[in-house]
């Protein structure tokens, strides 16, 4: 139950952050609901469990910081409403919205640049892969044209296959024995 109360408190905290600047009155209500949830979690917590007490204490500390933040926002909000006329307030809100839109545009631009670099890197890797594939094919072609090297390469690949089959069988037998006797 305590964990559910703390989870609800965290949800209220995220809602508080979203509504702080757009609707400070709603943020105040969310803060009060969050305080009630934390007090209920605190009353149901086991005092011998130091971890849960520390968790609840940190939640209360964050609640106090958010209350201070809300008080600051409310003071600024009240000061703006007293000083600014409704038209000036609307202009200020439009200006803030424009700043936020510019910030979003900048982050989208940065993301697009990052994606372009990633695609360019991918193309470079594909090009390097094709170059290395061509080099490997040329070396194998040259090696196959020389009879002595061709025989050595064939024997090596046959030994590798044989060794890998033997190793695979050994590992599978050991795994089966381990499973049966464990």
From Swiss-Prot:
Pfam families xrefs: V-SNARE_C
Topology with respect to the bilayer: Single-pass type IV membrane protein
Parts of the chain that traverse the membrane: 164-181
Cytoplasmic side of membrane: 1-163
GO molecular function: SNAP receptor activity
GO biological process, one term: intracellular protein transport
InterPro entries listed in its UniProt record: Golgi_SNAP_su1
Entry superkingdom: Eukaryota
Subcellular location: Golgi apparatus membrane
GO cellular component terms listed in the entry, alphabetical order: cis-Golgi network; Golgi apparatus; Golgi medial cisterna; Golgi membrane; SNARE complex
Keyword field contains Transmembrane: yes
Keywords in alphabetical order: Golgi apparatus, Membrane, Protein transport, Transmembrane, Transmembrane helix, Transport
Protein's UniProt keywords contain Transmembrane helix: yes
Residues exposed to the Vesicular side: 182
Subunit record text: Component of a SNARE complex consisting of sed5, gos1, ykt6, and sft1.
Family statement drawn from the similarity comment of this UniProt entry: Belongs to the GOSR1 family.
Purpose of the protein: Nonessential SNARE involved in retrograde transport within the Golgi complex.
Designated name of the protein: Protein transport protein gos1
Organism of this sequence: Schizosaccharomyces pombe (strain 972 / ATCC 24843) (Fission yeast)
Higher taxonomy: Eukaryota, Fungi, Dikarya, Ascomycota, Taphrinomycotina
